[in-house]
């Protein structure tokens, strides 16, 4: 097994950064189940991009590192996929050729679709209102809800015919994307979206009641209470709720307040808000999916291309544990064109993998965090996760959070073990010198179009170094963490038991 610490370029000392700390790791501490909710699903560029080999290669790379199960993308109903058409008399016709290639490609690589039902086919739209993405999706309601229901039903029936109900019943169907902002121009926004959802749920469930449907897929954690109430009061099917949040969303938009909420806290504060709304609703316990989240919705190389993502991700897992069934990082790849075709490999794209198949520090962070166990042990620290694998070995994440692009303070953590029979561990590090491709990219002059030789060099430079063997002496182990540092410690159990001191 390989592991690493992420050392960042620099970072501002924040409330999460700390100088020195002793952490007691007690194998007999209270614990709870720790499902890997953060790596079950990833977002990606729109539907048609899934046909590219570069997309599929990146998918295979991330699948190998995380074993993720679902992928979500926009625009399966966009005209470029070609599913919907009408003849001169207005009679609908359907063509599932590209859709089949899209879903065949996902399933062949061991990933199921989380189907976002969007956007509106031009010939079905009530108005030709385009959102400003490069591919200009139509974001108006349908002009004829009977035809919309027909499209949804024909689509679902075709999927079942091709893949079988036992397969498709394991997928999820989400109605639209972020209807509370500029992806929906129905009036009023909430009421017209609820109408869309009602018709969609009706059509889908009439094909087969085992198909799973949910929403509202809102930005900024919006509408959850009202949406559940609408479904309950009108007996509308609801198998899960979904929404989105980004760490730089404003408190005004997410909470309706002027409270200052740090980037490190925003995502999981929103997760707690939604969790509490669901538990207080008519559908307590309904699964909660964050079908988009990230540290930023801007393109910022100091965030999504930088080691900053390691501590931010680790701390997000710590804070969001128990608040959601699944979170979908936006996105797994920079095969992505919402703002246009990328002009260089590192522009602050959302993806874990840059153009040319170059893994970023965020990819390495996910790869490292995949090593965590499936039980979480209680620990008195805001900078650590202590987990246990099914066979009993302990895996610990440690981090030193600092705000992106500014300087922070190095720290040292001392682990003191109790009820742990171990004299050695493996320590994995990722920093500006190890596993961060940024330095090599700058060294070669930041080429806009790296040559094939340069791409090979960049991919090599992005690799995590082998885990270092470290000794546990007198039940103690010290780990140095720079600002933006993330470490994974895998404790190696002794063959014979030792008495803790």
Predicted features along the sequence, with ranges:
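Conserved, mostly hydrophobic/aromatic
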Residues: 41, 106, 155, 173, ...
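Aromatic/acidic polysaccharide-binding cleft in carbohydrate-active enzymes
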Residues: 289-408, 431
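N-terminal signal peptide c-region/cleavage motif recognized by signal peptidases
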Residues: 12-14
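Acidic, Ser/Thr/Pro-rich beta/coil linker or hinge segments at domain junctions
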Residues: 419-477
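Substrate-binding cleft and catalytic face of glycoside hydrolase catalytic domains
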Residues: 66-262, 273
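Carbohydrate-binding surface patches
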Residues: 382-439, 443, 483-490
């Amino acid at each position: 097994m390989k592991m690493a610490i992420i050392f960042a370029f620099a970072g501002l000392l924040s409330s999460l950064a700390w100088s020195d700390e002793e952490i007691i790791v007690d194998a007999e501490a209270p614990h709870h189940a720790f499902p890997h909710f953060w790596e079950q699903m990833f977002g990606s560029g729109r539907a048609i991009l899934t046909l590219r080999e570069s997309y599929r290669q990146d998918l295979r790379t991330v699948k190998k590192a995380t074993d993720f199960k679902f992928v979500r993308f926009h625009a399966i109903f966009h005209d470029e996929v070609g599913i919907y058409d009408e003849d001169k008399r207005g009679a609908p016709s359907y063509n599932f050729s590209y859709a089949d290639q899209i879903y065949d490609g996902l399933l062949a690589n061991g990933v199921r679709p989380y189907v976002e039902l969007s956007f509106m086919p031009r010939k079905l739209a009530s108005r030709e209102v385009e959102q400003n993405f490069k591919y200009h999706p139509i974001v108006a309601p349908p002009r004829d809800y009977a035809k919309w229901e027909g499209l949804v039903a024909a689509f679902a029936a075709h999927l079942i015919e091709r893949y079988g109900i036992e397969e498709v019943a394991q997928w999820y169907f989400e109605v639209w994307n972020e209807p509370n902002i500029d992806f929906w121009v129905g009036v009023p926004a909430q009421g017209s979206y609820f109408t869309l959802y009602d018709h969609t749920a009706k059509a889908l469930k009439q094909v087969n009641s085992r198909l799973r449907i949910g929403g509202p897929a809102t930005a900024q954690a919006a509408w959850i209470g009202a949406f559940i109430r609408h479904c309950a009061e009108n007996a509308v099917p609801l198998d899960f709720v979904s929404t989105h949040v980004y760490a730089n969303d404003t408190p005004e938009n997410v909470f309706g307040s002027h409270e200052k909420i740090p980037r490190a806290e925003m995502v999981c504060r929103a997760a707690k808000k939604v969790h509490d709304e669901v538990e207080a609703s008519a559908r307590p316990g309904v699964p909660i999916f964050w079908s988009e989240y990230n540290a930023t919705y801007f393109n910022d190389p100091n965030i999504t291309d930088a080691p900053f993502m390691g501590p931010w991700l680790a701390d997000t897992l710590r804070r969001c544990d128990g608040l959601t069934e699944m979170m979908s990082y936006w996105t797994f790849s920079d095969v992505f064109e919402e703002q246009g075709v990328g002009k260089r490999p590192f522009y602050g794209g959302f993806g874990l993998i840059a153009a040319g198949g170059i893994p970023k520090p965020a990819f390495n962070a996910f790869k490292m965090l995949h090593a965590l166990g499936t039980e979480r042990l209680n620990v008195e620290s805001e900078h650590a996760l202590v987990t246990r694998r099914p066979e009993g070995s302990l895996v610990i994440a440690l981090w030193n959070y600092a705000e992106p692009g500014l300087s922070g303070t190095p720290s040292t953590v001392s682990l003191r073990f109790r009820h742990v029979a171990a004299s050695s561990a493996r320590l994995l590090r990722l920093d500006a010198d190890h596993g961060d491709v940024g330095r090599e990219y700058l060294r070669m002059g930041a080429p806009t179009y790296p040559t094939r030789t340069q791409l090979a060099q960049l991919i090599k430079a992005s690799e995590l170094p082998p885990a270092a063997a470290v000794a546990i002496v007198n039940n103690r182990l010290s780990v140095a963490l720079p600002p933006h540092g993330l470490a994974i410690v895998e404790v190696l159990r002794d063959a014979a038991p030792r008495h803790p001191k």
